[in-house]
Amino acid sequence: MEYANILLKPVISEKATMVKDAANQVVFFVHPAANKIEIAKAVEKAFSVTVKGVRVVKHKSLARSRMGRVTGRIPGYKKAYVTLAQGDKIEFFEGV
């Protein structure tokens, strides 16, 4: 898998901001087939930082229903919590 296709987009949420400030971690939505090693190499190549560790969370797709009828599905996704080396930073929305 190519590194450009692994990182889909950064997660911008309250929890992701707290984790970034407290533990020097950044959170990304990643390709469902990507593993920890590929994610670490993609982040290092894309942002020129050193990665200390990667934790991965998979969310299953869920059935959406209205009035007892199943009308569709909410797609599943995969998130990666990437821990950066001390002194390294990835700035997405600093100063906004």
Curated annotation (Swiss-Prot):
Q: Which domain of life is it from?
A: Bacteria
Q: Which GO BP annotation is one of this protein's?
A: translation
Listed under GO cellular component are: ribonucleoprotein complex; ribosome
Q: Name one GO molecular function term.
A: structural constituent of ribosome
Xref: InterPro entries: Nucleotide-bd_a/b_plait_sf, Ribosomal_uL23-like, Ribosomal_uL23/eL15/eS24_sf, Ribosomal_uL23_CS
What are the protein's UniProt keywords? Ribonucleoprotein, Ribosomal protein, RNA-binding, rRNA-binding
Concerning its family, UniProt says: Belongs to the universal ribosomal protein uL23 family.
Subunit note: Part of the 50S ribosomal subunit. Contacts protein L29, and trigger factor when it is bound to the ribosome.
The record describes the protein's role as:
One of the early assembly proteins it binds 23S rRNA. One of the proteins that surrounds the polypeptide exit tunnel on the outside of the ribosome. Forms the main docking site for trigger factor binding to the ribosome.
PANTHER family in the record: 60S RIBOSOMAL PROTEIN L23A (PTHR11620)
HAMAP family, A to Z? Ribosomal_uL23_B
Name of the protein described by the UniProt record = Large ribosomal subunit protein uL23
